[in-house]
Amino acid sequence: MRVSESGFSLRIRLVLRGTRGEPTLIEGMKADSLECVPAPTAGIMKHGLEGGGEIQSLAVDLDHGKHDAKAVLKDGSLDPRPYFSKNFYELDEGESVVYEVLVLTRRQCRWRLAVQVRSGETTGTVHVDDVGAPFLASSVVWDRSGQNLGPYRTCLVSDNETGYIDRGAGCRQ
């Protein structure tokens, strides 16, 4: 089980590597295959994902818009324009780029990342998931009485064998 306790967010480190003889252009990134339900009342915890190389920070809001990756501004807000509408990245064969994607939600959502790429005249989408399963991001609601719906904490949950549950230290305020 993976968790971020940074308040409505999850960070995923994504390493993309060029594998073709000609350059590959990264043209877009967004959350895809999105399925959301209200947040559960629970808590789970796990270490973050790792990657190497220079890191480009992006954010995806699963609760608003078209779920395109956007730049995080210095004040912590999101640029209203999709990041790749003005920041294409060209990968040569063997070259890598690392994106740290901050995922925001107040619900529980299953999703994958869809990276739009072009190599020569060929375009396509590379789907990124959690070892074959969709990512599961969730905000946790600790009080469903109707009087107080906060505080929220955000968790990312993965069903793969590297996860674990910590019953004493889950997403608590």
Task: Give the residues covered by each predicted segment.
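Asparagine-centered strand-capping/turn motif at beta-strand->loop junctions
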Residues: 14-20, 103
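Short, solvent-exposed loop/turn segments enriched in Ser/Thr/Gly
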Residues: 4-12
